[in-house]
Amino acid sequence: MSENSSINEQLDWKKAKVIAAGIDIGAVNSKVVILLDGQPYAFSQVRTLIPKESASSAINAILDKTGLKMENIHSRVATGTGRSQVLFSQKTVSEIACAAAGAVKIWGPTVRTVLDIGGQSCKIIHCTDKGRVNDFLWNDKCAAGIGRSMESFADLVQKDITEIGKIALNSDELLRLSDFCSVFSLSEALDSILNKVPAEQVIAGYHNAMAKRISTLVAKLGLKEDLVIIGGLAKNPGIINELENILEVNRLAPKPAWDPALIAALGAAIFADAGHMRQ
């Protein structure tokens, strides 16, 4: 199982008063963020296969590199679609609440809308300057699975998510595809490629169709500035460009130190830290 992890070597967990872990078990990837006295210390990501095993793999990637043991972690909160299967968590919190808390922690108190585009779901969240949820809307059935659909499309054209995003961003023309449903759009894209339509036009058209599908969800709840976009698909520059054009608003710039797919895990760690401090 492939994993991606990083440790802040400037911090020493042995000197921390409170060690908190946030675990986000998504449909595509499982993520863990560790805080030391509220400061980011470590993160890891692994592919979600069997949720309870992926959760263990994600946290063990950090434990193995740092010498931390599970019993050293004072508080552990799980979130995401597979949160109930994290056997070592002490509490679960919804991914809606965690996304809002994590976004405000990273981008600051001006954030009012969080758009979370993950592998299996798309969520739009209104929040306060403290990172509390005011309102939210989950994807309708035709916006579901956009992240995974985009991965399938990338496999189809033998590129990764970031590569197809760059191609879409730089394309001068796009093929108009159905934006009603990600499955229909993917089928149309496949047919177009088989019919020798230039790949860059199909790629650009597919990004445009997915962005329109997402923007329909945003319109149902409404958009309040400032906007941040998180989740795995936030790393795709083509989707971001199309969304900003359709919504007629620029998102807050991404933070280079933070993978947008880690924000909900960070939020879970924030809840874990706050929960321990209240004890």
Protein language model regions, located:
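N-terminal glycine/serine-rich phosphate-binding loop of ATP-dependent small-molecule kinases
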Residues: M1-A97, N241-A257
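Active-site nucleophile and cofactor-binding loops and adjacent substrate-binding regions
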Residues: V46-L49, K91-A100, L115-G119, L137-G145, ...
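Glycine-rich phosphate-binding loop plus the immediately following alpha-helix
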Residues: D129-E173, I270, A274
